[in-house]
Structure formats: structure tokens, C-alpha cells
């Protein structure tokens, strides 16, 4: 549950850069070149963490390990129930629509063109539909089909009750990405693009392999997985309270939902065996509360994988 929307600043360029980025490469964004200017605006892109911040982060993680979750089984057996509770309480009010989706993943726009023909998008971990609605708003393709899935039954109810939900273009259903069964409503190797937006992190590492196999079976040859999720040492990881850590870099939030903080290297290990890596980027952003003079370091990973 990300309480700091990463689309809070209106920008015309992506804040993502490759993990192997060179300072000589050209890129857009808001760059902090002088430390004394840090409180001049609300956010800065591509801010590298200095030794002091990394030392504090390491200390924070070590302290968290002293107070692990005491009843792990409660969060590992039926994790979807915590998401049911979350969406039952918040419905569609918590998250903002991801208007940045086309900016970060322009490949989606090709599927939405009037003459694109039959195209299909699978949005996994759809939640309240905040990725779906901006896509439908941009769509000009009468032959587009969006399959929206989530393992929370309550989330699917929220999607279907939204006035923007149009059964002509969208089909929402309950499905567990890490389950052993594929979706009955989708043929194997039929999906043009799969969106994994702040979804994969909810899985336990021992579920990753099954999830990857399912993704591979659903995607067309040449199809894309569009991925964005929490990166290692993100602010939300460092702010985790006592008795929240399940295992290395795997936590529960205050509402019982789970989150794993990945690295670009892990993305290569997990996805690289089955897919061609088109992008493996990182979005390190410094969010500033100018009134309170507080600096908050955010880290998101963004990637594109092709079958």
C-alpha cells in the first residue's frame, strides 16, 4: 500500500533510467545539481544515495531483523484475505488512476490504435482498476480486450461496480498469479501485453517460479510484460515498524498485506531465464517536504520483458 503516489509531479518524461545507466547518457527529469537547492522543489529524479544514507538504511534493516513477525503462517496461507479487507474498507478511493501508464509504457498505445486489430491486455493485480481506466480512456481500438484479474474477490467487485467498467472491452475475474491453474477465460499464448504494476511484490519468493511459468504460458511469442514495483531500500521498507519482517526483504504492512523489495539483479535472475530483457530500469526519486524540511528517498523498479 503506497501512501506516496509516484505520479505526484506532472512530468513529460520518464523518471526511469537503466540500471547500467552512464552519466554521459541523455535523460529527462528534474536533476539536483547543487545540494543547497534540495528544498527548491518537491521532487528530484535520479538522486544517487550517498554513503550516509546507505549506512542509515543498513542500520535500519538490521534493527528490523531483531523484531520479525511472530506468526508467519497467518500471512502465508491465505494472503488474499488481507486484500479483501483492504478493498472492503477503501474500495476505489485509496489509489489514484495511473495516468502515467502510457508515458512509461508507450508500447500500450500501439494496441489502442483504431487500426490495431484484435489485441489483448492482461492486467494482473488489477486492484480497484487504476491501471485499466486510463487505458480505456485512451483506447480507439474496437477490437481491444482487457482481462483484469486479482486474487482478491473484493477487488474484482470494486472493478465491476465502477461506472467506467465496460464488458465490451473488459473482463474482470478472480485469479491467483502464483496458482497452479491458468485462467479458463484466456487461451494459452494469446496475450499481447501483460501489466504487472505493484503486483509481483505481493508474492512470496517461493511463488515466483510458478508465477513466471504462468506468465510465459499466457503471453504470445513477441508479447511483452510491463513491470513496475518497489525497489530495495525504498522509503516504505525503511519505515517498516517492529514485527513486520517475514524474511529477508519481505514484509507485511500494517493491514496485513505483503510486500517484497526487489533489486534489478533479482529481476534478471527471475525473469531472464524465460524472457528477453528489453528494459531493466530504476527510478530513484527524492521527495521533499519543503515545509517540514524532510527528505524522503523513493525507489521503484521498472522493466520490460519479451517472450
Curated annotation (Swiss-Prot):
Keyword set, alphabetical order:
Methyltransferase, S-adenosyl-L-methionine, Transferase, tRNA processing
EC annotation?
2.1.1.-
Q: Which GO terms describe its molecular function?
A: tRNA (cytidine-3-)-methyltransferase activity
State what the entry records as the consequence of deleting this gene.
Cells lacking trm140 show abolished N(3)-methylcytidine modification in tRNA(Thr). Cells lacking trm140 and trm141 show abolished N(3)-methylcytidine modification in tRNAs (tRNA(Ser) and tRNA(Thr)).
Pfam families in alphabetical order: Methyltransf_12 (PF08242)
Looking up InterPro entries in the UniProt record yields: Methyltransf_12 (IPR013217), METTL2/6/8-like (IPR026113), SAM-dependent_MTases_sf (IPR029063)
- Where is S-adenosyl-L-methionine annotated to bind? 83, 87, 125, 150, 176-177, 197
SS bond list: none
Domain of life of the organism encoding this protein: Eukaryota
Q: Where does the sequence pass through the membrane? A: none
The record lists the catalysed reaction(s) as: cytidine(32) in tRNA(Thr) + S-adenosyl-L-methionine = N(3)-methylcytidine(32) in tRNA(Thr) + S-adenosyl-L-homocysteine + H(+)
Top enzyme category? transferase
Listed under GO biological process in this entry are: tRNA C3-cytosine methylation
So what does this one do?
A: S-adenosyl-L-methionine-dependent methyltransferase that mediates N(3)-methylcytidine modification of residue 32 of the tRNA anticodon loop of tRNA(Thr). Does not catalyze N(3)-methylcytidine modification of tRNA(Ser).
UniProt record similarity statement = Belongs to the methyltransferase superfamily. METL family.
The entry's protein name is: tRNA N(3)-methylcytidine methyltransferase trm140
This protein's species is: Schizosaccharomyces pombe (strain 972 / ATCC 24843)
What's the source species' lineage?
A: Eukaryota, Fungi, Dikarya, Ascomycota, Taphrinomycotina
Annotated gene: trm140
